[in-house]
Regions:
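A generic local secondary-structure boundary/capping motif
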Residues: 15, 100-102, 159-162
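Short, basic/aromatic recognition patches
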Residues: 1-25
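Short, structured beta-strand-loop surface elements
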Residues: 62-128
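C-terminal edge-of-domain segments
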Residues: 117-237
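Pocket-edge structural micro-motifs
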Residues: 28, 61, 80-82, 174-176, ...
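Short, glycine- and charge-enriched coil/turn segments that flank and shape catalytic ligand pockets
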Residues: 45-52, 71-72, 203-205
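Short connector loops at helix/strand junctions that flank enzyme active sites
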Residues: 21, 36-38, 52-56, 71-75, ...
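Short beta-strand segments
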Residues: 21-63, 78, 89
Length: 237
């Protein structure tokens, strides 16, 4: 992935994206070509027993899905997407100053590469199902007016066992991550309030907060003694 230095996501951003996000596009190259599946996943940063710095992603697919049956050639790839949004040039202060502005698209994404391991084991799969359920039920309860938390144990055991037989577990042992947070860091600081206000007015608070936080970090880094000096010539891609 092309990542200009000012859009490179730091470790904390990557960890937050993998921890909070719910699903990824899992892509594998097989002898028959490329295969892809939307994969709900749980991130385990401490799964380093195989020497992986970043840990592993755990998930499952339908037993009828051919992707788990066809061996991956080389690394597999999971594409995790964070907030993304259209950015109108009408939001920039620079529009009124000189008019030399164009639209763009802000986004946060991580390309997670690793060794794909298949777990055709009901006990392993049940553990992952319980992790995923606990994660997303807890997140759901953060919103008001929710029904009580659901647990795997709320369903009849024989029903759960039948459901588990219909899925297969997948583990992506992470070998490397390429991550990008393109959040208007290439714009003059005077343009940032307009971007945040524009996104907020459209109801996209998540993108607005991402822009705000990324540019707060940028300002801290650009101050004397920060991690980098100011570089006025920054790519927009």
């Amino acid at each position: 992935m092309y990542i200009p230095a000012h859009f490179a996501a730091d470790d904390a951003t990557v960890h937050e994206l993998l921890t909070r996000h719910g699903a990824a596009d899992l892509i594998t190259l097989t002898a028959d070509g490329l295969l892809a599946t939307m994969l709900p996943f749980a991130y385990e940063p401490d799964a380093g027993e195989h020497g992986a710095r970043w840990g592993a992603l755990y998930g499952h697919v339908a037993r009828n899905n051919d992707q788990w049956r066809k061996p991956a050639l080389g690394e597999s790839l999971a594409i995790v997407r964070g907030p993304d949004a259209y950015v109108s040039p009408s939001w920039y202060a620079a529009k009124a100053e000189h008019g030399r502005v164009v639209p763009t698209w802000n986004y946060v994404t991580a390309h997670v590469y690793g060794q794909l391991v298949v777990h055709d084991d009901p006990a392993w799969v049940e553990d992952v199902v319980r992790r995923l359920t606990a994660k997303h039920e807890a997140a759901r309860l953060q919103s008001p007016g929710q029904s009580p938390q659901w647990s795997v144990d709320n369903a009849p055991r024989n029903f759960i066992e039948g459901q588990l037989r219909a899925i297969v577990g997948l583990e992506l042992r992470i070998t490397r991550i390429e991550a990008k947070a393109k959040l208007s860091q290439n714009r003059p600081v005077t343009d940032i309030p307009g971007v945040v206000a524009g996104l907020s007015a459209r109801g996209d608070d998540r993108s607005a907060q991402a822009v705000e936080h990324a540019n707060e970090r940028r300002e801290a880094q650009d101050r004397p003694g920060g991690r980098r000096g100011r570089n006025p010539a920054r790519s927009a891609n």
